[in-house]
Amino acid sequence: KMTMIVGFISTLLSMLAGDMSAKFLHKVQPEKLAAYEWHFDTQSQANLVFFGVLNEKTNEVSGAIEIPGMLSFLADNSLKTTVKGLNDFPKNELPPLIVHYFFDLMVSMGVFCFVISGIFMLILLIKKLRHLTTHKVVLYSILLTGPASMLAIEFGWFLTEMGRQPWIVRGYLRVSQAATQAGGITLVTILFGLLYLVLIVTSAYVLLRMFRNKPAINDVNQVLKERGDNK
Protein backbone atom coordinates (compact mmCIF):
# COMPACT_ATOMS: atom_id res chain seq x y z
CA LYS A 1 0.00 0.00 0.00
CA MET A 2 2.66 2.49 1.04
CA THR A 3 4.81 1.55 -1.97
CA MET A 4 2.00 2.30 -4.41
CA ILE A 5 1.11 5.59 -2.72
CA VAL A 6 4.73 6.73 -2.83
CA GLY A 7 5.00 5.43 -6.40
CA PHE A 8 1.94 7.38 -7.51
CA ILE A 9 3.25 10.60 -5.97
CA SER A 10 6.73 9.98 -7.40
CA THR A 11 5.44 9.46 -10.94
CA LEU A 12 3.45 12.69 -10.72
CA LEU A 13 6.57 14.54 -9.56
CA SER A 14 8.56 12.91 -12.38
CA MET A 15 6.05 14.24 -14.90
CA LEU A 16 6.47 17.71 -13.44
CA ALA A 17 10.25 17.35 -13.63
CA GLY A 18 9.93 16.26 -17.27
CA ASP A 19 7.85 19.33 -18.08
CA MET A 20 10.44 21.60 -16.44
CA SER A 21 13.25 19.78 -18.26
CA ALA A 22 11.58 20.33 -21.65
CA LYS A 23 11.32 24.06 -20.99
CA PHE A 24 14.96 24.20 -19.87
CA LEU A 25 16.16 22.36 -22.98
CA HIS A 26 14.10 24.61 -25.24
CA LYS A 27 16.03 27.62 -23.93
CA VAL A 28 19.49 26.16 -23.24
CA GLN A 29 19.93 23.03 -25.40
CA PRO A 30 17.34 23.24 -28.20
CA GLU A 31 19.19 20.72 -30.39
CA LYS A 32 18.86 18.14 -27.62
CA LEU A 33 15.10 18.65 -27.38
CA ALA A 34 14.79 18.46 -31.17
CA ALA A 35 16.75 15.19 -31.25
CA TYR A 36 14.54 13.67 -28.57
CA GLU A 37 11.51 14.31 -30.77
CA TRP A 38 12.98 13.91 -34.26
CA HIS A 39 11.93 17.50 -34.87
CA PHE A 40 13.67 18.61 -38.07
CA ASP A 41 11.95 21.79 -39.26
CA THR A 42 11.71 24.95 -37.17
CA GLN A 43 8.03 25.74 -36.66
CA SER A 44 5.29 26.68 -34.25
CA GLN A 45 2.60 24.17 -33.26
CA ALA A 46 5.27 21.47 -33.30
CA ASN A 47 4.04 17.93 -32.71
CA LEU A 48 5.15 15.61 -29.92
CA VAL A 49 6.31 12.35 -31.53
CA PHE A 50 6.12 8.95 -29.87
CA PHE A 51 7.62 5.78 -31.32
CA GLY A 52 7.97 5.52 -35.10
CA VAL A 53 10.87 4.64 -37.39
CA LEU A 54 13.20 7.26 -38.86
CA ASN A 55 14.52 7.24 -42.42
CA GLU A 56 17.77 9.15 -41.87
CA LYS A 57 18.24 9.76 -45.60
CA THR A 58 14.95 11.64 -46.01
CA ASN A 59 14.35 12.61 -42.34
CA GLU A 60 10.87 11.12 -42.64
CA VAL A 61 9.26 9.37 -39.66
CA SER A 62 6.82 6.53 -40.25
CA GLY A 63 4.52 4.71 -37.86
CA ALA A 64 4.71 7.38 -35.16
CA ILE A 65 2.02 8.59 -32.79
CA GLU A 66 1.89 12.39 -32.95
CA ILE A 67 0.18 14.79 -30.57
CA PRO A 68 -0.44 18.05 -32.48
CA GLY A 69 1.17 21.14 -30.95
CA MET A 70 2.23 19.37 -27.76
CA LEU A 71 5.99 19.87 -28.27
CA SER A 72 5.43 23.62 -28.59
CA PHE A 73 3.29 23.55 -25.45
CA LEU A 74 5.94 21.64 -23.50
CA ALA A 75 8.59 24.08 -24.68
CA ASP A 76 6.86 27.22 -23.40
CA ASN A 77 3.22 26.57 -22.39
CA SER A 78 1.87 27.75 -25.73
CA LEU A 79 0.85 25.92 -28.90
CA LYS A 80 2.21 28.89 -30.86
CA THR A 81 5.76 28.57 -29.48
CA THR A 82 8.35 28.17 -32.23
CA VAL A 83 10.57 25.14 -31.67
CA LYS A 84 13.91 25.12 -33.47
CA GLY A 85 14.48 22.07 -35.68
CA LEU A 86 17.54 19.90 -36.24
CA ASN A 87 18.02 21.26 -39.77
CA ASP A 88 18.98 24.63 -38.29
CA PHE A 89 21.98 23.26 -36.36
CA PRO A 90 25.43 22.26 -37.70
CA LYS A 91 25.41 18.51 -38.36
CA ASN A 92 28.62 17.99 -36.39
CA GLU A 93 26.92 19.38 -33.27
CA LEU A 94 23.87 17.11 -33.29
CA PRO A 95 23.30 14.26 -30.81
CA PRO A 96 22.82 10.73 -32.20
CA LEU A 97 19.18 10.41 -33.23
CA ILE A 98 18.85 7.05 -31.48
CA VAL A 99 18.06 9.09 -28.34
CA HIS A 100 14.44 9.23 -29.49
CA TYR A 101 14.07 5.51 -28.80
CA PHE A 102 15.40 5.95 -25.28
CA PHE A 103 12.90 8.77 -24.79
CA ASP A 104 10.07 6.48 -25.89
CA LEU A 105 11.21 3.69 -23.59
CA MET A 106 11.64 6.01 -20.61
CA VAL A 107 8.18 7.51 -21.07
CA SER A 108 6.59 4.08 -21.62
CA MET A 109 8.06 2.69 -18.39
CA GLY A 110 7.02 5.82 -16.49
CA VAL A 111 3.46 5.74 -17.83
CA PHE A 112 3.19 2.04 -16.94
CA CYS A 113 4.20 2.78 -13.33
CA PHE A 114 1.78 5.71 -13.19
CA VAL A 115 -1.15 3.67 -14.53
CA ILE A 116 -0.56 0.72 -12.17
CA SER A 117 -0.11 2.91 -9.09
CA GLY A 118 -3.13 5.00 -10.14
CA ILE A 119 -5.33 1.91 -10.51
CA PHE A 120 -4.18 0.67 -7.11
CA MET A 121 -5.03 4.03 -5.54
CA LEU A 122 -8.48 3.82 -7.13
CA ILE A 123 -8.96 0.32 -5.71
CA LEU A 124 -8.07 1.61 -2.24
CA LEU A 125 -10.52 4.50 -2.51
CA ILE A 126 -13.50 2.37 -3.58
CA LYS A 127 -14.49 -0.03 -0.78
CA LYS A 128 -16.19 -2.51 -3.10
CA LEU A 129 -12.93 -2.96 -4.99
CA ARG A 130 -10.54 -3.34 -2.06
CA HIS A 131 -10.63 -7.14 -2.25
CA LEU A 132 -8.76 -6.76 -5.55
CA THR A 133 -5.61 -5.62 -3.73
CA THR A 134 -4.62 -9.29 -3.39
CA HIS A 135 -5.74 -10.34 -6.88
CA LYS A 136 -2.97 -12.07 -8.84
CA VAL A 137 -3.15 -9.68 -11.79
CA VAL A 138 -2.82 -6.68 -9.47
CA LEU A 139 0.04 -8.22 -7.49
CA TYR A 140 1.97 -9.23 -10.62
CA SER A 141 1.43 -5.76 -12.10
CA ILE A 142 2.77 -4.19 -8.93
CA LEU A 143 5.75 -6.54 -9.06
CA LEU A 144 6.54 -5.37 -12.60
CA THR A 145 6.62 -1.71 -11.55
CA GLY A 146 9.90 -2.42 -9.72
CA PRO A 147 11.98 -3.30 -12.78
CA ALA A 148 9.95 -0.84 -14.90
CA SER A 149 10.93 2.07 -12.64
CA MET A 150 14.59 1.04 -12.73
CA LEU A 151 14.46 0.75 -16.52
CA ALA A 152 12.89 4.22 -16.71
CA ILE A 153 15.82 5.60 -14.70
CA GLU A 154 18.39 3.82 -16.89
CA PHE A 155 16.76 4.86 -20.16
CA GLY A 156 16.59 8.41 -18.82
CA TRP A 157 20.30 8.25 -18.07
CA PHE A 158 21.08 7.01 -21.59
CA LEU A 159 18.86 9.78 -22.93
CA THR A 160 20.67 12.47 -20.96
CA GLU A 161 24.22 11.28 -21.60
CA MET A 162 23.77 10.55 -25.30
CA GLY A 163 21.63 13.64 -25.78
CA ARG A 164 24.45 15.97 -24.76
CA GLN A 165 26.84 14.54 -27.35
CA PRO A 166 29.20 15.69 -28.78
CA TRP A 167 29.77 18.02 -25.81
CA ILE A 168 31.20 17.62 -22.32
CA VAL A 169 30.72 21.37 -21.81
CA ARG A 170 28.31 22.64 -24.45
CA GLY A 171 29.96 25.00 -26.90
CA TYR A 172 33.38 24.76 -25.23
CA LEU A 173 34.66 21.20 -24.78
CA ARG A 174 33.91 18.11 -26.86
CA VAL A 175 33.83 14.55 -25.55
CA SER A 176 36.66 13.66 -27.93
CA GLN A 177 38.82 16.33 -26.29
CA ALA A 178 38.00 15.29 -22.73
CA ALA A 179 38.16 11.48 -23.04
CA THR A 180 40.84 9.96 -20.83
CA GLN A 181 43.89 8.30 -22.34
CA ALA A 182 44.74 6.44 -19.13
CA GLY A 183 45.63 2.77 -19.48
CA GLY A 184 43.73 -0.01 -17.73
CA ILE A 185 40.26 1.47 -18.28
CA THR A 186 39.13 -1.53 -20.34
CA LEU A 187 40.23 -3.98 -17.65
CA VAL A 188 38.49 -2.03 -14.88
CA THR A 189 35.28 -1.86 -16.93
CA ILE A 190 35.34 -5.63 -17.53
CA LEU A 191 35.97 -6.32 -13.83
CA PHE A 192 33.06 -4.10 -12.79
CA GLY A 193 30.83 -5.86 -15.30
CA LEU A 194 31.81 -9.27 -13.94
CA LEU A 195 31.26 -8.08 -10.36
CA TYR A 196 27.73 -6.90 -11.13
CA LEU A 197 27.01 -10.12 -13.02
CA VAL A 198 28.04 -12.17 -9.97
CA LEU A 199 25.91 -9.97 -7.70
CA ILE A 200 22.86 -10.34 -9.95
CA VAL A 201 23.14 -14.12 -10.14
CA THR A 202 23.83 -14.48 -6.42
CA SER A 203 20.98 -12.17 -5.40
CA ALA A 204 18.52 -13.95 -7.70
CA TYR A 205 19.56 -17.34 -6.32
CA VAL A 206 19.22 -16.25 -2.68
CA LEU A 207 15.83 -14.60 -3.24
CA LEU A 208 14.47 -17.63 -5.07
CA ARG A 209 15.61 -19.91 -2.25
CA MET A 210 14.03 -17.60 0.34
CA PHE A 211 10.63 -17.24 -1.29
CA ARG A 212 10.16 -20.54 -3.11
CA ASN A 213 6.99 -22.19 -1.80
CA LYS A 214 6.68 -19.35 0.70
CA PRO A 215 4.22 -16.82 -0.79
CA ALA A 216 4.38 -13.43 0.89
CA ILE A 217 0.60 -13.45 1.36
CA ASN A 218 1.01 -16.26 3.92
CA ASP A 219 3.24 -14.02 6.03
CA VAL A 220 0.74 -11.18 5.70
CA ASN A 221 -2.13 -13.43 6.81
CA GLN A 222 -0.07 -14.67 9.76
CA VAL A 223 0.60 -11.11 10.91
CA LEU A 224 -3.09 -10.22 10.57
CA LYS A 225 -4.02 -13.33 12.55
CA GLU A 226 -1.62 -12.42 15.34
CA ARG A 227 -3.09 -8.92 15.44
CA GLY A 228 -6.62 -10.32 15.55
CA ASP A 229 -7.52 -8.55 12.32
CA ASN A 230 -9.80 -10.82 10.29
CA LYS A 231 -10.52 -8.31 7.53
Q: How would you label these PLM feature ranges?
A:
Residues K1, F114-E154, L208-D219:
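Juxtamembrane interface at the cytosolic side of transmembrane helices
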Residues V6-A75:
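Aromatic-rich transmembrane-lumenal/periplasmic boundary elements in polytopic membrane proteins
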Residues S10-A22, L79, L151-R164:
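C-terminal TM-helix exit segments that contain a strictly Trp-centered aromatic cap at the helix terminus
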Residues A17, S21, V198-A216:
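Membrane-helix cytosolic exit motif
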Residues E31-E37, K214-N230:
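Short, highly charged, low-complexity non-transmembrane loops/tails of multi-pass membrane proteins
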Residues N55-V111:
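Individual transmembrane alpha-helix segments
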Residues L105-L122, L195-S203:
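Hydrophobic alpha-helical transmembrane segments
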Residues T145-L191, L195:
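Membrane-proximal extracellular juxtamembrane segment immediately upstream
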